[in-house]
Amino acid sequence: MAIMEKEFHCKRDELTIRGMQYFPCPFEEKEKYPVAILCHGFTGNYRSMENYGRKFAELGYIAVGFDFCGGGALVQEDPVRSDGETTDMRISTEVEDLSAVIDQVKGFPYADLQRILLAGVSQGGFVAGLAAARRREEISGLIMVYPALCIPDHARRGCLGGACYDPKKVPDRIDCGRSVLGKGFHDEVAGMDPFLELSAYGGRVLLIQGLEDGIVDYSYAVKARASYEKGQCRLQLVRNMGHSPDEGQFESIFASIRQFLAGREEILSIRIIITHSEKLCDNGAEQCNLYFTGYCESPYFQGTVLPGGCDVRREDPGKGKAVRAEYTLEGLDCEGQRCRLHIVNQWGQEDWEPVIRTDSRALAWLNEADLTAVLENGAGGPTVRIFAGRAGE
């Protein structure tokens, strides 16, 4: 889908904030569009969020990416364009920057003021969460991807941004390699309880965290989910992902973001474990069969994939590719009753479209449910996340 780009700028005090807007195409200025405001991480800039901006625009959003004042790395080919020095930057100044961007966006005649979403990665995710809490009546949704909720702990340990210093004798300048922070950054966050501050936000939250993140341990994300009301925050833990996704992981992450934006609930998470494969040729057609086992642990069902699960990938000359997985799980439903789920999953026009048949009375609604799925690739086999509009309806 084609998109349009336009430079963005606004003021915070005497500093100019610069970035880029991403528009769906075609775009009608008289129409109202939902808005996604994107927050980059430590030593990043708005260009590091460009892939998110384009994806949101393809979904019909106006996306706004910007450089935090004093953010970014000291030396980089594509420098930060907003004003400010890194030694003056703090978490609070970034929240103020984001607040200024929100105010600017609310003045756009084409912005749907009922649908303003904040999304951020790493330090930008932390900042987005704080800003959502402080402007909770104006923010319709929050997406935090590996948010750096570890920052206060890192300050208390004297290792902010990868630096090493004595937290009892904090230097005026904290050398983080690619950037230099001021002592004020440390002093501000060292006494902060990020989870208490995040909890003030009452809207829908999606929190995505890699299990192999060497900077932000996934325990911070687990604790963050617990700080919100029950059912308010969906936590997605991604296998084999560190402190940034590879291309395939980004695609599956954004597929999950798309389900979140559509208001769909993850009802089943199935860990697939590939056991063996075989290749077949038939009248010029090539077919690969992947056999697998696996297991599911979710609030609705817990069980294992029975022997015989198979993913068939076939390519016929003139007909293109077709992918179809079929398998059966056996286990216990949400009422503790033994049951089976038979799943057929194949690609539709825009999403994976699984069909489930079950003998569970408690899960009988699955037999008629409108379902979609996201495949999240990982070592040994994917995780299949199945979504429904609202469970039980």
Q: What are these language model-derived features?
A:
Residues 1-30:
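N-terminal cap/lid segment of alpha/beta-hydrolase-fold proteins
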Residues 42-54:
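The serine-hydrolase catalytic nucleophile loop
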Residues 55-81:
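Conserved alpha/beta-hydrolase
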Residues 85-108:
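Alpha/beta-hydrolase active-site loop
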Residues 134-181:
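Hydrolase active-site cap/lid region
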Residues 201, 207-209, 213:
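Short beta-strand/loop motif that positions the catalytic acidic residue
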Residues 241-254:
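Catalytic histidine-centered segment of alpha/beta-hydrolase-like enzymes
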Residues 266-393:
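Beta-strand-enriched cores of mature, soluble protein domains
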